[in-house]
Amino acid sequence: MGCSASKDTTNSKDGAASKGGKDGKTTADRKVAWERIRCAIPRDKDAESKSRRIELFKRFDTNGTGKLSFREVLDGCYSILKLDEFTTHLPDIVQRAFDKAKDLGNKVKGVGEEDLVEFLEFRLMLCYIYDIFELTVMFDTMDKDGSLLLELQEFKEALPKWKEWGVDITDATTVFNEIDTNGSGVVTFDEFSCWAVTKKLQVCGDPDGEGAAKTTADRKVAWERIRCAIPRDKDAESKSRRIELFKQFDTNGTGKLGFREVLDGCYSILKLDEFTTHLPDIVQRAFDKAKDLGNKVKGVGEEDLVEFLEFRLMLCYIYDIFELTVMFDTMDKDGSLLLELQEFKEALKKWKEWGVDITDATTVFNEIDTNGSGVVTFDEFSCWAVTKKLQVCGDPDGEENGANEGN
């Protein structure tokens, strides 16, 4: 897309119109294809979407390495998702999304040049693909002659559409010149997409912004149920419930729980997956913390099991991590599992509810961002949150000697 290209507006618009569009597709064809694509890309955070995403990743991963190259992603977008039904620019779209997800993954992991996307970045990449597709819809709506360059007149003719997209433009020429950053007199897709993202033109590749009220209400109901379901207290009734729960978890009858038994119990008995799609990660963190503390107390080295003495502590850790997840997800609007400074600032009112009055958000954000990557991971957030005691009271007695269940 050269910025110096010129347009023959006399003939090219008529030619595009006679074909029904720049790639031979009519508007109706493209709408049908777009609706199918919206359903085909599993971007949501619910359990069903995650299950579809796991299966899709396996199908994309033709080499079986657990990491996807650009070629594997592009082939999958053609042969499995069939995204080429919508656009002739699929390689460009996939390349943009692949690079953004890969670069962010490398930045967080501290890796330099790894040219692969792992499962942790896969959802983010799908969100980017969706975003770029949706921006393509907007751009194509205005780009009547299919030259991949917008002229001022085309921009002005699309003003009624801008209101639908969430922007009320009063001075089209000024805005057009703002978008045309290199002053060429035409707007490229790159220039348009950079500007559109800053204006948040209802481009919500991560659908958590859509219907967020319903999601929040559902999560509140689930969270209240989970608060009651995890018997963390030291009173007689809670201990009795804990003994019964341990027996239900202990399907092998050994008096010790492996990680698989704990995870299965959290799914089938406590039903903690109603609240989050990250249950395996949460349980793994809690299991490891309780197990390691138990081994330290007992003087055992590597036993990979949790006994009843550590069971209450493990439940407390699960509760802690769930509550931290609530906090993190409240701020992480785009679902990338990374917090940006702007997201952190937008949550300042919430911080007061969580027990911290922040006056200098940038300084605190940089304090949390211990590796200086410019984004905050959940690990960084949770480590900092625990030091601030953000009303995260997994162990309701404030004690970490929960390995002693004899109390």
From Swiss-Prot:
<feature type="binding site">
    <location>
        <position position="145"/>
    </location>
    <ligand>
        <name>Ca(2+) 2</name>
    </ligand>
</feature>
<feature type="binding site">
    <location>
        <position position="147"/>
    </location>
    <ligand>
        <name>Ca(2+) 2</name>
    </ligand>
</feature>
<feature type="binding site">
    <location>
        <position position="373"/>
    </location>
    <ligand>
        <name>Ca(2+) 6</name>
    </ligand>
</feature>
<feature type="binding site">
    <location>
        <position position="334"/>
    </location>
    <ligand>
        <name>Ca(2+) 5</name>
    </ligand>
</feature>
<keyword id="KW-0282">Flagellum</keyword>
<dbReference type="InterPro" id="IPR054322">
    <property type="entry name" value="FCABP_EF-hand"/>
</dbReference>
<feature type="region of interest" description="Ancestral calcium site 2">
    <location>
        <begin position="110"/>
        <end position="121"/>
    </location>
</feature>
<keyword id="KW-0969">Cilium</keyword>
<dbReference type="InterPro" id="IPR011992">
    <property type="entry name" value="EF-hand-dom_pair"/>
</dbReference>
<feature type="binding site">
    <location>
        <position position="369"/>
    </location>
    <ligand>
        <name>Ca(2+) 6</name>
    </ligand>
</feature>
<feature type="binding site">
    <location>
        <position position="180"/>
    </location>
    <ligand>
        <name>Ca(2+) 3</name>
    </ligand>
</feature>
<dbReference type="GO" id="GO:0031514">
    <property type="term" value="C:motile cilium"/>
</dbReference>
<feature type="binding site">
    <location>
        <position position="332"/>
    </location>
    <ligand>
        <name>Ca(2+) 5</name>
    </ligand>
</feature>
<dbReference type="Pfam" id="PF22592">
    <property type="entry name" value="FCaBP_EF-hand"/>
</dbReference>
<dbReference type="GO" id="GO:0005509">
    <property type="term" value="F:calcium ion binding"/>
</dbReference>
<feature type="binding site">
    <location>
        <position position="252"/>
    </location>
    <ligand>
        <name>Ca(2+) 4</name>
    </ligand>
</feature>
<feature type="binding site">
    <location>
        <position position="61"/>
    </location>
    <ligand>
        <name>Ca(2+) 1</name>
    </ligand>
</feature>
<protein>
    <recommendedName>
        <fullName>Flagellar calcium-binding protein TB-44A</fullName>
    </recommendedName>
</protein>
<feature type="binding site">
    <location>
        <position position="191"/>
    </location>
    <ligand>
        <name>Ca(2+) 3</name>
    </ligand>
</feature>
<feature type="domain" description="EF-hand 3">
    <location>
        <begin position="167"/>
        <end position="202"/>
    </location>
</feature>
<dbReference type="InterPro" id="IPR051581">
    <property type="entry name" value="Ca-bind_SignalingProt"/>
</dbReference>
<feature type="domain" description="EF-hand 5">
    <location>
        <begin position="319"/>
        <end position="354"/>
    </location>
</feature>
<feature type="binding site">
    <location>
        <position position="261"/>
    </location>
    <ligand>
        <name>Ca(2+) 4</name>
    </ligand>
</feature>
<feature type="binding site">
    <location>
        <position position="380"/>
    </location>
    <ligand>
        <name>Ca(2+) 6</name>
    </ligand>
</feature>
<comment type="function">
    <text>May contribute to the rapid motility of the trypanosomes, playing a role either in flagellar structure or in calcium metabolism. Could alternate between a GDP-bound inactive form to a calcium/GTP-bound active form.</text>
</comment>
<keyword id="KW-0106">Calcium</keyword>
<dbReference type="InterPro" id="IPR003299">
    <property type="entry name" value="Calflagin-bd"/>
</dbReference>
<feature type="binding site">
    <location>
        <position position="154"/>
    </location>
    <ligand>
        <name>Ca(2+) 2</name>
    </ligand>
</feature>
<feature type="domain" description="EF-hand 4">
    <location>
        <begin position="237"/>
        <end position="272"/>
    </location>
</feature>
<feature type="binding site">
    <location>
        <position position="336"/>
    </location>
    <ligand>
        <name>Ca(2+) 5</name>
    </ligand>
</feature>
<feature type="binding site">
    <location>
        <position position="371"/>
    </location>
    <ligand>
        <name>Ca(2+) 6</name>
    </ligand>
</feature>
<feature type="binding site">
    <location>
        <position position="72"/>
    </location>
    <ligand>
        <name>Ca(2+) 1</name>
    </ligand>
</feature>
<feature type="region of interest" description="Disordered">
    <location>
        <begin position="1"/>
        <end position="27"/>
    </location>
</feature>
<feature type="binding site">
    <location>
        <position position="254"/>
    </location>
    <ligand>
        <name>Ca(2+) 4</name>
    </ligand>
</feature>
<feature type="region of interest" description="2 X 186 AA almost perfect repeats">
    <location>
        <begin position="25"/>
        <end position="399"/>
    </location>
</feature>
<feature type="binding site">
    <location>
        <position position="250"/>
    </location>
    <ligand>
        <name>Ca(2+) 4</name>
    </ligand>
</feature>
<keyword id="KW-0677">Repeat</keyword>
<feature type="binding site">
    <location>
        <position position="182"/>
    </location>
    <ligand>
        <name>Ca(2+) 3</name>
    </ligand>
</feature>
<dbReference type="InterPro" id="IPR018247">
    <property type="entry name" value="EF_Hand_1_Ca_BS"/>
</dbReference>
<dbReference type="InterPro" id="IPR002048">
    <property type="entry name" value="EF_hand_dom"/>
</dbReference>
<feature type="region of interest" description="Ancestral calcium site 6">
    <location>
        <begin position="299"/>
        <end position="310"/>
    </location>
</feature>
<dbReference type="Pfam" id="PF13499">
    <property type="entry name" value="EF-hand_7"/>
</dbReference>
